[in-house]
């Protein structure tokens, strides 16, 4: 989501230039972000988005921009988390239908707003209420999210505390960074930089590697390993990679509070 800063002619031209070399070599799979929407009482998607990414024209479900695609043994479910509650309810029914009939070994859900926010526990409550029970019920392996302009990864745990799917990631590639909360449920954070993920499936293993986009250095890495019964276990290779919490304060109250949260988190994790 948020492929364009604002749905205007100038901003769309910037988006086209940025996508030009990528779109000629790779298929571009998108979800809608809040910046693609026009701000009315009922939000309205700017018309050019569906014309550029024309698969949306074939996948309208109750005026929701949702679709699913399958690639080999992986199925991706793309949601529109920007909508009002009654539209999210329609998406919930669609997602359950799609997950219920899916026979894919690997399932990935993609949406703009994180189901577990790193900006505050009450943020995105409608999205979490609608979609997360389905993520857990139908064995989704990976949830890819954006919007909150930092990096974070949260891993589910079984009854005995063992790490397992689903894995939730929040990421962004914008020069703008947010003052986030360091929720104890998350395994890893990154602030003050940009990030991208590379996901590969090989046999019984799905690998997610996250990179710092400014250096292309590996920043986080997890392997989801699935047995023949569909039960998964997780290998956290990212815990051996140091966390980078970069922040330069100019002395404002919000900045001072964020610096305090960083210091408390570092103390909790034993980060120097």
Regions found by a protein language model. Give the residues of each.
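C-terminal luminal/periplasmic domains and tails of membrane-associated envelope-modifying transferases
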Residues: 246, 253, 257-272
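Histidine-centered catalytic micro-motifs
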Residues: 109-115, 141-151
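Active-site glycine-centered loops adjacent to acidic/histidine catalytic or metal-binding residues
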Residues: 1-2, 33-34, 79, 112, ...
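Short acidic, glycine-rich surface-loop motifs adjacent to enzyme active sites
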Residues: 1-3, 102-119
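Outer-membrane beta-barrel translocator/channel fold
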Residues: 118-126
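Binuclear metal-dependent phosphoesterase catalytic core
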Residues: 160-250
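Short active-site segment of divalent metal-dependent hydrolases/proteases
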Residues: 4-5, 36, 115, 150
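Extended active-site neighborhood of metal-dependent phosphoesterases/phosphodiesterases
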Residues: 9-103, 122, 130-131, 142, ...
């Amino acid at each position: 989501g948020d492929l364009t800063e604002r749905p205007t002619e100038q901003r769309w031209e910037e988006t086209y230039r940025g996508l030009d070399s990528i779109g000629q070599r790779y298929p571009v799979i998108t979800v809608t972000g809040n910046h693609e929407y026009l701000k009315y009482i009922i939000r309205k998607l700017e018309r050019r988005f569906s014309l550029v990414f024309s698969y949306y024209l074939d996948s309208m479900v109750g005026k929701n921009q949702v679709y699913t695609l399958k690639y080999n043994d992986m199925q991706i479910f793309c949601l529109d988390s920007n909508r009002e509650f009654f539209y999210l309810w329609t998406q919930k029914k669609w997602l359950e239908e799609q997950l219920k009939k899916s026979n894919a070994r690997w399932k990935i859900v993609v949406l703009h707003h994180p189901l577990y926010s790193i900006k505050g526990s009450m943020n995105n409550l409608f999205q979490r209420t609608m979609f997360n029970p389905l993520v857990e019920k139908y064995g989704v392996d990976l949830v890819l999210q954006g919007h909150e302009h930092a990096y974070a990864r949260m891993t589910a745990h079984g009854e005995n505390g063992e790490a397992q799917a689903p894995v939730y990631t929040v990421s962004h590639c914008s020069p703008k960074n947010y003052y986030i909360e360091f929720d104890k449920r998350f395994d890893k954070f990154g602030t003050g930089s940009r990030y991208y993920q590379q996901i590969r499936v090989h046999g019984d293993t799905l690998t997610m590697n996250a990179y710092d986009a400014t250096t292309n250095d590996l920043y986080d890495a997890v392997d989801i390993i699935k047995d023949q019964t569909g039960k998964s276990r997780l290998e956290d290779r990212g815990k051996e990679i140091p966390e980078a919490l970069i922040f330069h304060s100019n002395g404002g109250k919000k900045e001072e509070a964020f610096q305090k949260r960083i210091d408390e988190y570092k103390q909790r994790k034993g980060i120097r």
